[in-house]
């Protein structure tokens, strides 16, 4: 955990697959799907198509995977990830019950399809404010994106900037090099969309440095400036950064002799032994060697 205490709350998720019977039920009723009856004409999300879309577009596939996920810690409801559908209720219950593990399933809330309009995100500034309508901010599907995290990220940026504008403070603008939120917004406002936009690591040219293990280093100072990081958390962050900087300096200065003990550790890590002195920092650059691996020989740690 980066700045808080560890959380070990876990629950089981399950995997299952559709089969030939599932496919047949859907094909027999495909004419009842608004997606294929001409009632919905918009371009759907590319990365989470409905089950009938999967069956029709990938007819050569013998089965499709789905995830069965608990909706919460205090409910027996399960969410079927990968099984969205626009088919009628009786068809849904019929094809769900063809799937292994769901033979006796009951539906709490049916799957459904929606079609909605969105604005052209090219009209937006980096603050998510409309250029032609000062004071109006957009976020989420309204901006042409798809997904919960994408909507939440934009909602945060739009809301923060609306508040900052009222307070007459500098806006919050996240760039591509510092966050995936910055990449998401930059793509929307400079490239526009032809189908619902989903954020993926492959969209960022900085993905090697936009990692979860340095998220606090990249974003905590911004949060502090906004007033979202209290003194206790900021002190903890500064302490961690100071320790990290000191350890990196020590790694550059610490030199190990080519002893048998060192080479035994290196060989056990399946990397080549050394014949001359070597810096700790150089050993840590080897992909096979972790910081913990060198504990037995790094007596100054």
Segments and roles (model prediction):
Residues 141-149, 205-207:
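Glycine-rich phosphate/pyrophosphate-binding beta-alpha loops
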Residues 42-49, 110-119, 172-188, 202-204, ...:
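A glycine-rich phosphate-binding loop feature that marks nucleotide/adenosyl-phosphate handling sites
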């Amino acid at each position: 955990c980066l700045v808080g205490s560890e959380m070990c709350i876990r629950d089981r998720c399950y995997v299952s697959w559709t089969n030939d019977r599932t496919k047949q039920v859907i094909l027999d009723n495909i004419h009842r799907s608004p997606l294929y009856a001409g009632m919905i004409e918009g371009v759907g999300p590319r990365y989470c198509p409905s089950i009938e879309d999967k069956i029709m577009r990938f007819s050569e596939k013998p089965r499709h995977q789905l995830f069965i996920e608990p909706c919460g810690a205090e409910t027996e409801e399960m969410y079927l990830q990968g099984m969205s559908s626009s088919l009628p209720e009786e068809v849904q219950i019929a094809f769900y019950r063809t799937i292994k593990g769901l033979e006796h399933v009951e539906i709490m809330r049916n799957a459904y399809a929606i079609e909605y309009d969105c604005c052209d995100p090219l009209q937006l500034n980096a603050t998510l404010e409309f250029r032609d309508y000062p004071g109006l901010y957009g976020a989420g599907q309204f901006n042409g994106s798809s997904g919960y995290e994408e909507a939440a990220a934009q909602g945060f940026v739009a809301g923060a900037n609306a508040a900052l504008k009222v307070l007459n403070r500098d806006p919050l603008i996240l760039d591509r090099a510092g966050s995936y939120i910055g990449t998401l917004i930059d793509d929307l406002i400079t490239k526009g969309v032809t189908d619902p936009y989903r954020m993926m690591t492959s969209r960022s040219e900085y993905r090697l440095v936009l990692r979860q293990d340095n998220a606090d280093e990249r974003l905590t100072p911004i949060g502090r400036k906004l007033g979202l990081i209290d003194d206790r958390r900021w002190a903890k962050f500064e302490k961690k950064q100071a320790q990290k900087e000191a350890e990196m300096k020590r790694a550059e200065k610490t030199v190990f002799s080519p002893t048998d003990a060192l080479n035994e550790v290196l060989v056990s890590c399946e990397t080549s032994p050394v014949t001359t002195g070597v810096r700790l920092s150089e050993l840590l650059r080897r992909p096979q060697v972790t910081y913990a691996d060198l504990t037995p020989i790094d007596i100054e740690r």
